[in-house]
Amino acid sequence: HALDTPHFPQELTSALSKNICITFFSGMFKNVESVAEIFDSLGPSFKQDQA
């Protein structure tokens, strides 16, 4: 009976890994965007410090 079911967990794990990858990359891109916004808001003060 154990040999009858392997295809189902495989589909489950592949779907889970896809979801994990999607959430991971979307989270990474969100972090990159927020970091870019932080640097944009800090940009003028950095330029003032350099001047």
From Swiss-Prot:
Superkingdom of source: Eukaryota
GO molecular function, one term: calcium ion binding
Keywords recorded for this protein, A-Z: Calcium, Metal-binding, Secreted
GO CC aspect terms: extracellular region
Subcellular location: Secreted
Gene Ontology BP, a term: otolith mineralization
Subunit composition and interactions: Interacts with OTOL1.
Function: Major protein of the otoconia, a calcium carbonate structure in the saccule and utricle of the ear. Together with OTOL1, acts as a scaffold for otoconia biomineralization: sequesters calcium and forms interconnecting fibrils between otoconia that are incorporated into the calcium crystal structure. Together with OTOL1, modulates calcite crystal morphology and growth kinetics. It is unlikely that this protein has phospholipase A2 activity.
Family statement: Belongs to the phospholipase A2 family.
Protein name as catalogued: Otoconin-90
Organism, as annotated: Cavia porcellus
Gene (name only): OC90
